[in-house]
């Protein structure tokens, strides 16, 4: 079975699906709210290169967060893109970076406009959610679709909502009024204003998801979700060429099948799984914060530690209190520029006298055989 191939007969082709793989991708598209969904069998690194190569041409400018995955860099080298890096806000106390503020994106766009290069900007590339749990408005966020709170910050939900909003008369009036206000605006005014998109704007959103990391799938199982109004007319051919370039003619059918199994599982049980995951993370926070010895040396970082106050319009600094339990996360996720995924637990170990790497290697791994994914 490990050597199954479309040439053997009776099996569908990942490169030109027309049978069960085509149906599985259509079901995944329905589940995740995309217009089209494509499966990949060698990870989201490949998905990233496919999307960049499909959309970007030599000389195009791409805005990308400086802390992005290395596959984006390789994709942009292959596409011949000119890169403008976006800086995240720093968390100096913890030797970490946060997220890219909207002001930083607008600052770079205004600089490109002044240089006469704004028309060459082709793509904005951001990582949502980050390893540390910072959420923007998807590689490690596939489960978010199946929680009402999380869903509103997913790429596909946002794209669908934005497309509906752009068609309303209220939006057109608001845009017209703001444009009149901005006629004599300075660059600083543009940076401070919450800009309203023109009604004629085209919604073009792509999300690559590491299904194998945040849902049930074999290693390297990933998906590309597309919500692009111009996909059929402008991108479809180049997308399929990029997909053919980076996809093996002998894909692992077990990985493909596991992607379909993972989709079916979360459609049936996803809400319960996500709720239990959040509850387990909150229980862990309570255990650390209430233990007399642990709380002396360890601190679980909350939203107030990782997101500056001016990006938390709700004013909430923690989603969980040892005495009172949960706060109303939904309000935070509706209002704040950035939110913190409560299932990502970031533990500050500075109180032990060790830095993160030393604590990970010399204590947890060498003494207790506990492996930690990421430290700073």
What residue ranges belong to the model's regions?
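Conserved N-terminal alpha-helix of the aminotransferase class I/II PLP-enzyme fold
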Residues: 2-46, 194
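Residues within well-ordered alpha-helices
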Residues: 25, 72, 137, 359-361
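Glycine- and acidic
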Residues: 9-11, 33-35, 240-245, 266-271, ...
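General small-molecule cofactor/ligand-binding pocket signal
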Residues: 38, 84-86, 373
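Conserved PLP-enzyme active-site core in the AAT-like
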Residues: 42, 46-57, 63-293
């Amino acid at each position: 079975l490990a050597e199954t191939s479309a040439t053997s007969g009776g099996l569908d082709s990942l490169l030109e699906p027309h049978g069960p793989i085509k149906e599985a991708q259509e079901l995944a598209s329905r589940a995740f709210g995309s217009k089209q969904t494509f499966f990949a069998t060698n990870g989201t690194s490949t998905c990233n290169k496919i999307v960049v190569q499909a959309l970007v041409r030599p000389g195009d400018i791409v805005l990308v967060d400086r802390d992005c995955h290395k596959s984006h860099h390789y994709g942009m080298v292959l596409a011949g893109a000119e890169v403008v890096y976006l800086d995240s806000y720093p968390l100096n106390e913890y030797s970490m970076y946060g997220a890219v503020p909207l002001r930083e994106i607008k600052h770079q766009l205004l600089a490109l406009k002044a240089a006469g290069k704004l028309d060459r900007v082709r793509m904005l590339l951001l990582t949502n959610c980050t390893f540390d749990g910072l959420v923007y408005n998807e590689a490690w966020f596939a489960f978010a679709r199946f929680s009402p709170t999380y869903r509103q910050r997913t790429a596909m939900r946002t794209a669908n909502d934005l497309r509906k909003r752009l068609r309303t008369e209220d939006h057109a009036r608001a845009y017209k009024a703001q444009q009149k206000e901005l006629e004599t605006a300075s660059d600083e005014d543009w940076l401070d204003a919450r800009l309203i998109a023109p009604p004629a704007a085209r919604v073009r959103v792509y999300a690559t998801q590491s299904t194998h990391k945040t849902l049930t799938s074999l290693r390297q199982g990933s998906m590309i979700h597309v919500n692009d109004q111009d996909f059929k007319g402008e991108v479809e051919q180049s997308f399929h060429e990029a997909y053919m370039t980076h996809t093996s003619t002998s894909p692992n059918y077990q990985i493909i099948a596991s992607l379909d199994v993972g989709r079916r599982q979360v459609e049936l049980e996803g809400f319960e799984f996500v709720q239990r995951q959040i509850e387990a993370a909150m229980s862990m926070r309570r255990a650390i914060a209430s233990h007399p010895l642990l709380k002396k040396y360890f601190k679980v970082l909350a939203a107030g530690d990782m997101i500056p106050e001016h990006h938390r319009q709700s004013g909430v600094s923690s989603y969980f209190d040892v005495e009172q339990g949960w706060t109303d996360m939904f309000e935070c996720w509706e209002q704040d520029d950035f939110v913190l995924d409560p299932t990502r637990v970031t533990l500050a170990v500075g109180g032990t006298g060790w830095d993160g790497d030393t604590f990970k290697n010399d204590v947890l791994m060498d003494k207790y055989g506990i492996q930690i994914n990421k430290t700073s």
